[in-house]
Amino acid sequence: MTKSLDRTPLTRDFFDRDVLEVAPDLLGRTLVRREPAGTIELRLTEVEAYAGEVDPGSHAFRGRTARNSTMFGPPGHTYVYFTYGMWHCLNLVCGPDGHASGVLLRAGEIAVGAHLARDRRVSARNDKELAKGPARLATALDVDRALNGSDLFGGPAPALSVLHGTPPPRDLVRSGPRTGVGGDGAHQPWRFWIDGDPTVSPYRAHAPRRRPSRKAT
């Protein structure tokens, strides 16, 4: 990280905006994970916006459930979900209370605490891969459902918080379809990333799940 880092925490008002404003504005910000083992700081390089009940790609599209209830809460909280029976993904809730929009944190560069991330991401070939993808990011930061609903502004040293960091120049911010989203939500250009950054994950279009074929007996 060559530019000076602004360590001022973001305010709740930052998240109390439309998700399509918040998502690209999170690029270059510093996500801080505090835990007993130490602190990890990550520069966000890739995110996706999910616009709640009006967005077919959102978990909140069909309304409130026990699983997604955190999304309907006030801005500046976390929404952590479990997927494919093995991975966690970290989202930051934004917009007005009850609006159910959020930003999926897809990738970032570990700037502080890489030794902690390496212990959890032993398959990473290098440090650029430690948080390259949403499941890898959550694993590197030791994020699971226990952190669902965490307040980014919950006291002087919350488990997760976001600093101003160093936003990239506007001409380096790119947008395109979200990874793995199909149906009516497939074409919104709501994935945002820093162009040319080696920690950004590769784009993958939606592929319908296929049931295993049964062999004839």
Swiss-Prot record:
SUPFAM superfamilies assigned to the protein according to its UniProt record, in alphabetical order: FMT C-terminal domain-like
Q: Which UniProt keywords apply?
A: DNA damage, DNA repair, Hydrolase
Which GO-annotated molecular functions does the record name?
alkylbase DNA N-glycosylase activity; DNA binding
Gene3D superfamilies documented for this protein:
Methylpurine-DNA glycosylase (MPG)
- BP GO terms, sorted: base-excision repair
Region annotation (Disordered) maps to 197-217
**What protein family is recorded?**
Belongs to the DNA glycosylase MPG family.
This protein is called: Putative 3-methyladenine DNA glycosylase
**Organism, as annotated:** Streptomyces griseus subsp. griseus (strain JCM 4626 / CBS 651.72 / NBRC 13350 / KCC S-0626 / ISP 5235)
